[in-house]
UniProtKB/Swiss-Prot annotation:
Protein name: Deoxyuridine 5'-triphosphate nucleotidohydrolase
InterPro entries hit by this protein: dUTPase, dUTPase-like, dUTPase-like_sf, dUTPase_trimeric
Organism for this UniProt entry: Pectobacterium atrosepticum (strain SCRI 1043 / ATCC BAA-672)
Gene that specifies this protein: dut
Similarity comment text for this entry: Belongs to the dUTPase family.
Pathway: Pyrimidine metabolism; dUMP biosynthesis; dUMP from dCTP (dUTP route): step 2/2
Binding site for substrate: 71-73, 84, 88-90, 98
CDD domains: trimeric_dUTPase
Cofactor: Mg(2+)
EC identifiers of the protein: 3.6.1.23
Catalytic activity: dUTP + H2O = dUMP + diphosphate + H(+)
Function: This enzyme is involved in nucleotide metabolism: it produces dUMP, the immediate precursor of thymidine nucleotides and it decreases the intracellular concentration of dUTP so that uracil cannot be incorporated into DNA.
MF-aspect GO terms: dUTP diphosphatase activity; magnesium ion binding
Amino acid sequence: MMKKIDVKIVDPRVGQQFPLPTYATPGSAGLDLRACLDQAIELKAGETTLIPTGLAIHIADTGLAAVILPRSGLGHKHGVVLGNLVGLIDSDYQGQLMVSVWNRGQQTFTVEPGERIAQMVFVPVVQAEFNLVEDFVGSERGEGGFGHSGRS
Protein backbone atom coordinates (compact mmCIF):
# COMPACT_ATOMS: atom_id res chain seq x y z
CA MET A 1 0.00 0.00 0.00
CA MET A 2 1.37 3.40 -0.98
CA LYS A 3 1.48 6.14 1.64
CA LYS A 4 0.91 9.75 0.67
CA ILE A 5 3.25 12.31 2.19
CA ASP A 6 2.49 16.04 2.14
CA VAL A 7 5.18 17.95 0.25
CA LYS A 8 5.31 21.73 0.23
CA ILE A 9 7.29 23.52 -2.46
CA VAL A 10 9.07 26.39 -0.69
CA ASP A 11 10.98 27.56 -3.76
CA PRO A 12 8.94 28.21 -6.95
CA ARG A 13 11.75 26.84 -9.15
CA VAL A 14 10.97 23.32 -7.90
CA GLY A 15 8.65 21.68 -10.40
CA GLN A 16 9.63 24.27 -13.01
CA GLN A 17 13.39 24.79 -13.33
CA PHE A 18 14.23 21.83 -11.05
CA PRO A 19 12.24 18.57 -11.28
CA LEU A 20 10.24 17.26 -8.33
CA PRO A 21 11.82 14.23 -6.63
CA THR A 22 10.95 10.99 -8.37
CA TYR A 23 11.90 7.35 -8.08
CA ALA A 24 14.39 6.62 -10.89
CA THR A 25 13.16 3.03 -11.41
CA PRO A 26 10.23 0.93 -10.17
CA GLY A 27 12.62 -0.76 -7.72
CA SER A 28 14.20 2.44 -6.38
CA ALA A 29 13.97 2.86 -2.61
CA GLY A 30 15.19 6.46 -2.61
CA LEU A 31 14.04 9.72 -4.14
CA ASP A 32 16.78 12.03 -5.38
CA LEU A 33 16.98 15.44 -3.71
CA ARG A 34 18.32 18.34 -5.76
CA ALA A 35 20.36 21.41 -4.89
CA CYS A 36 17.98 24.36 -5.04
CA LEU A 37 20.64 27.01 -5.65
CA ASP A 38 20.79 30.37 -7.41
CA GLN A 39 24.32 29.67 -8.60
CA ALA A 40 26.95 26.95 -8.39
CA ILE A 41 28.78 26.48 -5.09
CA GLU A 42 32.44 25.51 -4.93
CA LEU A 43 33.06 23.15 -2.05
CA LYS A 44 36.77 23.00 -1.27
CA ALA A 45 38.37 19.85 0.13
CA GLY A 46 37.33 19.42 3.76
CA GLU A 47 34.51 21.98 3.60
CA THR A 48 30.91 21.42 4.67
CA THR A 49 27.87 23.48 3.68
CA LEU A 50 24.08 23.32 4.00
CA ILE A 51 22.23 23.17 0.69
CA PRO A 52 18.49 23.84 0.41
CA THR A 53 16.26 21.44 -1.53
CA GLY A 54 13.37 23.85 -2.03
CA LEU A 55 11.03 21.30 -0.42
CA ALA A 56 9.42 20.86 2.97
CA ILE A 57 7.66 17.66 4.00
CA HIS A 58 5.26 16.73 6.77
CA ILE A 59 5.18 12.97 7.17
CA ALA A 60 2.52 13.22 9.92
CA ASP A 61 2.33 9.42 10.40
CA THR A 62 4.22 8.58 13.64
CA GLY A 63 4.90 5.13 12.18
CA LEU A 64 7.14 6.65 9.49
CA ALA A 65 10.31 8.72 9.27
CA ALA A 66 12.60 9.67 6.41
CA VAL A 67 16.34 9.28 6.18
CA ILE A 68 18.54 11.38 3.93
CA LEU A 69 21.43 9.36 2.55
CA PRO A 70 24.40 10.14 0.30
CA ARG A 71 24.32 9.29 -3.39
CA SER A 72 26.81 6.51 -3.98
CA GLY A 73 28.40 8.04 -7.08
CA LEU A 74 29.16 11.37 -5.41
CA GLY A 75 30.85 9.64 -2.50
CA HIS A 76 32.78 7.06 -4.50
CA LYS A 77 33.85 9.21 -7.45
CA HIS A 78 34.24 12.62 -5.78
CA GLY A 79 34.44 12.07 -2.01
CA VAL A 80 31.27 14.13 -1.48
CA VAL A 81 29.07 12.73 1.29
CA LEU A 82 26.66 14.05 3.91
CA GLY A 83 28.19 16.17 6.64
CA ASN A 84 26.11 14.37 9.26
CA LEU A 85 26.49 11.02 7.42
CA VAL A 86 22.73 10.31 7.68
CA GLY A 87 19.93 12.83 8.13
CA LEU A 88 16.82 11.81 10.08
CA ILE A 89 13.50 13.52 9.36
CA ASP A 90 10.96 12.91 12.12
CA SER A 91 7.26 12.60 11.33
CA ASP A 92 6.43 15.91 13.04
CA TYR A 93 9.10 18.02 11.27
CA GLN A 94 7.64 20.54 8.83
CA GLY A 95 10.58 22.71 7.77
CA GLN A 96 12.56 22.84 4.55
CA LEU A 97 14.74 19.84 3.83
CA MET A 98 18.36 20.94 3.97
CA VAL A 99 21.28 18.71 3.02
CA SER A 100 24.61 19.00 4.82
CA VAL A 101 27.21 18.28 2.14
CA TRP A 102 30.84 17.49 3.06
CA ASN A 103 33.69 17.30 0.58
CA ARG A 104 36.00 14.71 2.15
CA GLY A 105 37.87 14.43 -1.14
CA GLN A 106 41.14 16.10 -2.16
CA GLN A 107 39.76 18.30 -4.96
CA THR A 108 37.32 21.21 -5.01
CA PHE A 109 33.86 19.98 -6.03
CA THR A 110 31.30 22.22 -7.71
CA VAL A 111 27.63 21.71 -6.80
CA GLU A 112 25.48 22.94 -9.68
CA PRO A 113 21.93 24.29 -9.34
CA GLY A 114 19.49 21.40 -9.72
CA GLU A 115 22.17 18.74 -9.21
CA ARG A 116 21.08 15.58 -7.40
CA ILE A 117 22.93 15.75 -4.08
CA ALA A 118 21.31 13.16 -1.80
CA GLN A 119 18.50 10.64 -1.64
CA MET A 120 15.59 10.29 0.74
CA VAL A 121 14.12 6.99 1.88
CA PHE A 122 10.98 6.56 3.99
CA VAL A 123 11.30 3.97 6.74
CA PRO A 124 8.99 2.45 9.36
CA VAL A 125 9.44 3.58 12.97
CA VAL A 126 8.96 1.56 16.13
CA GLN A 127 9.22 3.43 19.41
CA ALA A 128 10.59 1.22 22.17
CA GLU A 129 9.11 0.91 25.61
CA PHE A 130 11.86 0.12 28.10
CA ASN A 131 11.45 -2.57 30.73
CA LEU A 132 14.02 -2.60 33.56
CA VAL A 133 15.30 -6.13 34.25
CA GLU A 134 18.02 -7.69 36.41
CA ASP A 135 19.15 -10.15 33.70
CA PHE A 136 18.34 -11.10 30.13
CA VAL A 137 17.16 -14.49 29.00
CA GLY A 138 20.28 -16.20 27.62
CA SER A 139 20.95 -16.24 23.87
CA GLU A 140 23.49 -18.14 21.77
CA ARG A 141 25.43 -14.94 21.05
CA GLY A 142 25.35 -13.57 24.57
CA GLU A 143 27.62 -10.56 25.01
CA GLY A 144 29.77 -11.20 21.89
CA GLY A 145 30.49 -7.78 20.38
CA PHE A 146 32.86 -6.32 17.81
CA GLY A 147 34.51 -9.06 15.75
CA HIS A 148 32.89 -11.89 17.69
CA SER A 149 32.11 -13.94 14.59
CA GLY A 150 35.59 -13.76 13.01
CA ARG A 151 36.52 -12.91 9.44
CA SER A 152 35.99 -16.11 7.47
